[in-house]
Design a protein with these regions (language model features):
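Short S/T/G/P-rich N-terminal loop/turn motif that feeds into the first structured element of a domain
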Residues: 1-48, 55-65, 78-95
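A common structural junction motif
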Residues: 70-74
Length: 95
């Protein structure tokens, strides 16, 4: 399994950012291999993160190459390039 963390900064009001995230939710639910996605926010103004859990490297790579992934900066009107971190999950506590 793969854990992907996409940290982003946006000047959108939180309500608008959440509205856009909810509108895009069905597209993310339809992604093969995406086991879970967490929508999170930082204590810093305008700082958010999407935390993704992928079933395989192939699913993760397929998403990275997708139009949906490439649309993230525009959809949330990012003010700088997102910070993306990818980690291999060694094991999980609960299943």
């Amino acid at each position: 399994m793969i854990l992907q963390i996409i940290k982003l900064k946006s000047n959108l009001p939180e309500e608008e950012l959440l509205k856009r995230a909810k509108e895009r939710e069905p597209q993310f639910k339809a992604i093969p291999g995406l086991m879970q996605k967490y929508y999170t926010k930082s204590d810093q103004k305008g700082a958010y993160a999407g935390i993704y859990v992928w079933d395989s490297q192939e699913s993760f790579q397929s998403f990275r190459d997708s139009d949906l992934a490439k649309s993230i900066p525009e959809a949330y009107e990012l003010i700088e390039a997102p910070n993306i971190e990818t980690l291999d999950i060694l094991f999980q506590l609960r299943k």
